[in-house]
């Protein structure tokens, strides 16, 4: 029944494509069963130096969590047949047979060759009622990508899973296209509505943790940003806690390397691609923040979650405007892309952690009247230092004014 299913790939303009799966009449009548087997995936060919880091990721270990292959199965339902999925910024595409499966290869335009996922292969596996979606990094050549896909072993095992509620091919692809349009995000606010604290100010904070019996706890404590230090190296950090990509961003003289900013004019993805209109080098700086949390409540808080997030804000005419450094448009360009490690948002480095929860950013215990001092750090572009604010509410918001930020405020750490 495999060859009853086929892909259609149609070009639109220079860089647009329409993709759909179709099938013979018999296949069109096939009803998706209530249960289908789980799928086991392996490969008879793995590029030299690559290894499986879990059952769905094949990567070069030295590239960390970027690039390589990422595999994802979705259901193939008869409603998926004939559904057209539009795609843009495609610079190479072909329909072909991969081993015993019909499939499509797509390569996308990517401004930075830096761990980007810039290729995809879709395979239809009708005997298992699945489509396999393979996302492939720019550290893999087209030939290697095709060779891996041709040598995949895709088999159902004895565990059955219910099909109700599982993602389907067209549902997944169409939701991917609409995801970005729905969210209402607040990025501008009247400055009277935004509480702002200075370095050295003490303010209240709601935190979550557990009591000594292991039960969920919400308490109000106080927080204070004691100091902010700016550095062009990583000497302030605990060497054991330095993220690998930061360590790799140090140049020969021990300083943070510069960041190449590419100013990009957007194409429409069909007749034109994004293009770099100018580039410049900027310095990257370490932002090292010391914060003290004090428990004023009458109860010990165990496994207290803490989280710092960095925002970039500008003020004008009584309005505070949040901007995302990469999303700034200007004269002749629509956004900025870069190769360095500079990044606002959630803290990347933090000095206190415990083996608990997701990410370990917990204070294991803070008794009534006790204070805990800790450090958080980011690397940012020097040009953003004059606009930095810190969110320690614990919600991690950095790309919008969340209700916690509007209630509990931000700390002005501009330099």
Enumerate the predicted regions with their spans:
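Glycine-centered tight beta-turn/hairpin loop motif at sheet-sheet or coil-to-beta transitions
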Residues: 63-68, 114, 127-129, 216-220, ...
């Amino acid at each position: 029944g495999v060859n009853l299913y086929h892909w259609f790939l149609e070009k639109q303009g220079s860089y647009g494509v329409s993709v759909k799966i179709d099938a013979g009449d018999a296949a069109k009548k096939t009803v998706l069963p209530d249960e289908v087997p789980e799928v086991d995936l392996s490969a008879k060919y793995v590029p030299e130096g690559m290894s499986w880091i879990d059952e769905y990721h094949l990567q070069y270990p030295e590239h960390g969590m970027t690039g390589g292959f990422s595999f994802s199965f979705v259901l193939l339902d008869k409603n998926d047949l004939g559904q057209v999925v539009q795609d843009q910024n495609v610079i190479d595409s072909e329909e072909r047979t991969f081993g015993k499966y019909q499939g499509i290869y797509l390569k996308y335009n990517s401004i930075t060759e830096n761990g980007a996922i810039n290729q995809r292969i879709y395979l239809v596996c009708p005997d298992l009622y699945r489509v396999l979606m393979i996302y492939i990094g720019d550290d893999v050549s087209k030939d290697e990508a095709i060779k891996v896909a041709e040598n995949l072993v895709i088999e159902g095992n004895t565990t059955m899973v219910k099909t109700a509620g599982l993602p389907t091919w067209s549902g997944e692809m169409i939701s991917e296209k609409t995801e970005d349009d729905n969210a209402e995000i607040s990025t501008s606010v009247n400055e009277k509505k935004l509480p702002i604290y200075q370095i050295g100010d003490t303010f209240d904070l709601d935190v979550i943790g557990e009591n000594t019996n292991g039960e969920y706890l919400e308490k109000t404590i106080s927080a204070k940003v004691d100091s902010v230090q700016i550095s062009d190296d990583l000497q302030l950090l605990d060497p054991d806690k330095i993220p690998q990509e930061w360590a790799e961003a140090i140049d020969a003289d021990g300083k943070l390397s510069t960041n190449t900013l590419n100013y990009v004019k957007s194409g429409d993805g069909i007749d034109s691609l994004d293009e770099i209109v100018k580039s410049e080098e900027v310095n990257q700086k370490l932002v090292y923040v010391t914060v003290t949390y004090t428990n004023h409540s009458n109860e010990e808080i165990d496994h207290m979650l803490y989280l710092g997030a960095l925002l970039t804000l500008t003020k004008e005419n009584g309005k505070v405007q949040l901007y995302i450094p990469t999303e700034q448009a200007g004269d002749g360009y629509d956004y900025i892309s870069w190769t360095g490690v500079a990044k606002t948002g959630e803290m990347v480095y933090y000095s206190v952690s415990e083996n608990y929860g997701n990410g370990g950013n917990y204070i294991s215990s803070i008794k009534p009247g006790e204070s805990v001092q800790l450090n958080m750090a980011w690397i940012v572009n020097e040009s953003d230092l004059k606009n930095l604010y810190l969110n320690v509410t614990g919600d991690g918001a950095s790309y919008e004014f969340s209700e916690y930020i509007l209630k509990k405020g931000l700390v002005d750490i501009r330099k």
